[in-house]
């Protein structure tokens, strides 16, 4: 019968460093699922459309970088083993989103945001602090963050032309996954943040979206 491996604090720190490198280095994230865009036809996009869609996908890619860092920070400080496992599992699913977004950005002849290391560090710190407060707050932060991501995805789906079926397929699958992450966090006992806290989080999200759209 297999036994669960127990990691020392140093082991976990090294694993976190490895995850950070795989998140931030180009082409280093290996998705477990193929991109939904693979089976979709190419669209005849003009230069302005391609540039705008690339900007939106860059925002989504950075959002996934932040989510990955958030989950890793929370997993590092989670008090209950089952909560830590849930965070690590969610982080694994976010790798798919990271890879899909990067692939699409490259197809549009653009690049991920140069600000990703900054946002990774900030999000990791926030996640670790939330985990130190309590698992309930940590899970609640996941739910609130994922709901914010879903809102961004909805806004982007409204802006992306219907003929760009590749980008739309990616965002639609991401939305399904993110909504599931949010609901799972609440079902696991996550705290439902009040409106003022959610509003503050939305303001921080706007800083990220405005800055990463172009760089």
From Swiss-Prot:
Gene3D superfamilies: 1.20.1260.10. GO terms for cellular component: plasma membrane. It is a peripheral membrane protein. The keyword Metal-binding applies. It is found in: Cell membrane. Fe cation 2 binds at residues 94, 146, 178, 181. It comes from the Bacteria. It catalyses: a 5-methoxy-2-methyl-3-(all-trans-polyprenyl)benzene-1,4-diol + AH2 + O2 = a 3-demethylubiquinol + A + H2O. It is an enzyme of class 1 (oxidoreductase). Keywords: Cell membrane, Iron, Membrane, Metal-binding, Monooxygenase, Oxidoreductase, Ubiquinone biosynthesis. Pathway: Cofactor biosynthesis; ubiquinone biosynthesis. NCBIfam families: DMQ_monoox_COQ7. This is 3-demethoxyubiquinol 3-hydroxylase. It comes from Pseudomonas putida (strain GB-1).
